[in-house]
Amino acid sequence: AMNDSTIYGVCGEGTSMHNLELISDGGDTLSVFIDDENPDVVQGGLLAGDRIALIGYKAEDGEMMAQKIINLTSLLGKWTSLDKNFDILEGGEVKNNVKAETNPWTSWKILNGKLLLNKDTFAIDKLGSDSLMLENTQGIFVFKRQE
């Protein structure tokens, strides 16, 4: 199995536009620099208390830098497209709402900054309040959030 370089935790109160304060699942409080010249770094926004998946690296000066930040709290919920209708649930479960679906997604996880749905690997191009854009070799898939 591939090693997952993702750090999981909760977004801290000290988070700002250029700095993620991450209280990791291991109990450490990390301060991570966010370069806002690349708007794709943060997906799903940053709200204190939200669950976060971080892909980071150490800069030469030792500072922790964010390569990708995925707000897992924002990822949860009901998403629909023309042919898909599914709920991303806490704990890695996907609930499929299309009866005729032949190969439904039943599980999800983050691996090295990518979203795995069953065995399908997607880059998260955009995670907004009402839309989710996933990309893989087969193309770009856009989903809308349903309340």
Give each language-model segment a name:
Residues M2-I7, E13, L82-L127:
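N-terminal glycine/threonine-rich, aromatic-flanked beta-hairpin/loop signature
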Residues T15-V32:
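OB-fold (S1/OB) nucleic-acid-binding surfaces
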Residues I23-D28, N97-T102, N118-A123, E135-F141:
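Secondary-structure transition/turn motif
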Residues T29, G56, T106-K109:
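Broad hydrophobic/π-residue packing in well-ordered secondary structure
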Residues A1-H18, V41-E90, D130-E147:
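Short, flexible, surface-exposed loop segments at domain boundaries
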Residues D25-G27, E37, Y57-A59, G113, ...:
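Solvent-exposed coil/turn segments that connect beta secondary-structure elements
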Residues G27-G44:
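Beta-strand/loop nucleic-acid-binding surfaces
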